[in-house]
Amino acid sequence: MTSSGVLCLLGALSLQVLLLQPPGAQGAPNPDNSHSSSPAPPQTAQHLSQKSLKRETLKPAAHLVGDPSVQDSIHWRANTDHAFLRHGFSLSNNSLLVPTSGLYFVYSQVVFSGASCSEITPTLLYLSHEVLLFSSKYQVHVPLLSAQKSVCSGTQGPWMRSVYQGAVFLLTQGDRLSTYTDGVSHLLQSPSSVFFGAFAL
């Protein structure tokens, strides 16, 4: 073979080797990566938690319990015995102040108890518990939830009656929620028996 033939053979082999190499190795840009950016840094648990917190809407909520040291009325309190005020709710003059307008589930429970009923004069004992709304729309206390119980009609010995109420209401910012109870002297004052609250839906 002549020297010119050897040179032609070497050139053909070199071209074949170049064609077999990936585009990046040939000095040409890779069409698949020409517009790709550098890989994003790994996200830490803290970053993910912050993003989740931003996405989550923090809704107002409140849960109050009765003060067992007050016997002649229900004195609501927060920040004790699993009671709390969150995300705008406040407690003023024994009333819950609604922070924002919207739908709320309002609830309350009381438990009445007594040692016995009089055998001589077994008159009925009426018990009631209400959740009241005071709003700029009405300027009076309007009952939202109301329930009544009666005892001692032929009943002897210790007795107990529980009242739980709850429903959804459309409330306005600035509305005040309070309670009224008839038969306070018979209340079983404990955090798990006497409570009052609301939370936004």
Curated annotation (Swiss-Prot):
<comment type="similarity">
    <text>Belongs to the tumor necrosis factor family.</text>
</comment>
<comment type="subunit">
    <text>Homotrimer, and heterotrimer of either two LTB and one LTA subunits or (less prevalent) two LTA and one LTB subunits. Interacts with TNFRSF14.</text>
</comment>
<dbReference type="Pfam" id="PF00229">
    <property type="entry name" value="TNF"/>
</dbReference>
<feature type="disulfide bond">
    <location>
        <begin position="117"/>
        <end position="152"/>
    </location>
</feature>
<dbReference type="GO" id="GO:2001238">
    <property type="term" value="P:positive regulation of extrinsic apoptotic signaling pathway"/>
</dbReference>
<dbReference type="GO" id="GO:0006959">
    <property type="term" value="P:humoral immune response"/>
</dbReference>
<keyword id="KW-1015">Disulfide bond</keyword>
<keyword id="KW-0964">Secreted</keyword>
<keyword id="KW-0202">Cytokine</keyword>
<feature type="compositionally biased region" description="Polar residues">
    <location>
        <begin position="31"/>
        <end position="51"/>
    </location>
</feature>
<feature type="signal peptide">
    <location>
        <begin position="1"/>
        <end position="27"/>
    </location>
</feature>
<dbReference type="GO" id="GO:0005615">
    <property type="term" value="C:extracellular space"/>
</dbReference>
<dbReference type="GO" id="GO:0050830">
    <property type="term" value="P:defense response to Gram-positive bacterium"/>
</dbReference>
<dbReference type="GO" id="GO:0005164">
    <property type="term" value="F:tumor necrosis factor receptor binding"/>
</dbReference>
<keyword id="KW-0325">Glycoprotein</keyword>
<keyword id="KW-0472">Membrane</keyword>
<dbReference type="GO" id="GO:0002876">
    <property type="term" value="P:positive regulation of chronic inflammatory response to antigenic stimulus"/>
</dbReference>
<keyword id="KW-0732">Signal</keyword>
<dbReference type="InterPro" id="IPR006052">
    <property type="entry name" value="TNF_dom"/>
</dbReference>
<protein>
    <recommendedName>
        <fullName>Lymphotoxin-alpha</fullName>
    </recommendedName>
</protein>
<feature type="glycosylation site" description="N-linked (GlcNAc...) asparagine">
    <location>
        <position position="93"/>
    </location>
</feature>
<dbReference type="GO" id="GO:0032729">
    <property type="term" value="P:positive regulation of type II interferon production"/>
</dbReference>
<dbReference type="InterPro" id="IPR021184">
    <property type="entry name" value="TNF_CS"/>
</dbReference>
<dbReference type="GO" id="GO:0016020">
    <property type="term" value="C:membrane"/>
</dbReference>
<dbReference type="GO" id="GO:0002925">
    <property type="term" value="P:positive regulation of humoral immune response mediated by circulating immunoglobulin"/>
</dbReference>
<dbReference type="GO" id="GO:0043123">
    <property type="term" value="P:positive regulation of canonical NF-kappaB signal transduction"/>
</dbReference>
<dbReference type="GO" id="GO:0005125">
    <property type="term" value="F:cytokine activity"/>
</dbReference>
<dbReference type="InterPro" id="IPR002960">
    <property type="entry name" value="TNF_beta"/>
</dbReference>
<feature type="domain" description="THD">
    <location>
        <begin position="60"/>
        <end position="201"/>
    </location>
</feature>
<dbReference type="GO" id="GO:0048535">
    <property type="term" value="P:lymph node development"/>
</dbReference>
<feature type="region of interest" description="Disordered">
    <location>
        <begin position="23"/>
        <end position="52"/>
    </location>
</feature>
<comment type="function">
    <text>Cytokine that in its homotrimeric form binds to TNFRSF1A/TNFR1, TNFRSF1B/TNFBR and TNFRSF14/HVEM. In its heterotrimeric form with LTB binds to TNFRSF3/LTBR. Lymphotoxin is produced by lymphocytes and is cytotoxic for a wide range of tumor cells in vitro and in vivo.</text>
</comment>
<dbReference type="InterPro" id="IPR006053">
    <property type="entry name" value="TNF"/>
</dbReference>
<dbReference type="InterPro" id="IPR008983">
    <property type="entry name" value="Tumour_necrosis_fac-like_dom"/>
</dbReference>
